[in-house]
Amino acid sequence: MSVIAKQMTYKVYMSGTVNGHYFEVQGDGKGKPYEGEQTVKLTVTKGGPLPFAWDILSPQSQYGSIPFTKYPEDIPDYVKQSFPEGYTWERIMNFEDGAVCTVSNDSSIQGNCFIYNVKFSGLNFPPNGPVMQKKTQGWEPNTERLFARDGMLIGNNFMALKLEGGGHYLCEFKSTYKAKKPVKMPGYHYVDRKLDVTNHNIDYTSVEQCEISIARKPVVA
């Protein structure tokens, strides 16, 4: 029997650096894990206002809150199976201008609340680039491909940030999800996601986000 209820809350504790600037973020989220819907309110508690675009942080607290993904019955849900022991994930984000972010997350559960402890490091963002100039305007919807390897779930996708004035800033995400106990492994599949910032104050020290996340098999399989 799953320890995950139809409606769950979660807490985010994120800390890290971007081009040497230290920050901390805390958040409170809620959603429906079996329907793939979630919302979160996030606050910069140290290091604000941030001298870089919020958008590089936004996927770490939602496309990062993986239990809130709707899975069909014929695909084993790797992450939900991992609880109550939980799981970890590690991610590398390679941007087209040479900037790199490394991220780790340790996810646990307390009652009807997930706890996410996130560590973030961003390096080599050009001073005149869209991140340090805060010229990004949110992520396009994306699709992650996922496959099993050595008891872990490997994810890979190509993301695109919308830019002020038009165009896109591209980034490849490589994620490794590791359950803290043996679970039934899924086959090759996809997860479609749409992440939006729905509200924020002028300096992005208080942000609200929502995400829809749905798993599926390949359309032409």
Swiss-Prot record:
PTM remark: Contains a chromophore consisting of modified amino acid residues. The chromophore is formed by autocatalytic backbone condensation between Xaa-N and Gly-(N+2), oxidation of Tyr-(N+1) to didehydrotyrosine, and formation of a double bond to the alpha-amino nitrogen of residue Xaa-N. Maturation of the chromophore requires nothing other than molecular oxygen. The precise stereochemistry of the tyrosine has not been determined.
Keyword annotations of the record: Chromophore, Luminescence, Photoprotein
Tell me which domain of life the UniProt entry assigns to the organism this sequence originates from. Answer: Eukaryota
Q: Where is this cross-link: 2-iminomethyl-5-imidazolinone (Gln-Gly)?
A: Q62-G64
Q: Do you know which InterPro entries this protein is assigned to?
A: GFP (IPR009017), GFP-related (IPR011584)
Q: Give the 2,3-didehydrotyrosine positions (modified residues).
A: Y63
Q: What biotechnological purpose does this protein serve?
A: Fluorescent proteins have become a useful and ubiquitous tool for making chimeric proteins, where they function as a fluorescent protein tag. Typically they tolerate N- and C-terminal fusion to a broad variety of proteins. They have been expressed in most known cell types and are used as a noninvasive fluorescent marker in living cells and organisms. They enable a wide range of applications where they have functioned as a cell lineage tracer, reporter of gene expression, or as a measure of protein-protein interactions.
Q: Which GO terms describe its biological process?
A: bioluminescence
Subunit comment: Homotetramer.
Summary of the function given for this chain in its UniProt record? Non-fluorescent pigment protein that is lilac in color.
* Family designation: Belongs to the GFP family.
The name on file for this protein is GFP-like non-fluorescent chromoprotein
Instruction: Specify the species.
Output: Goniopora tenuidens
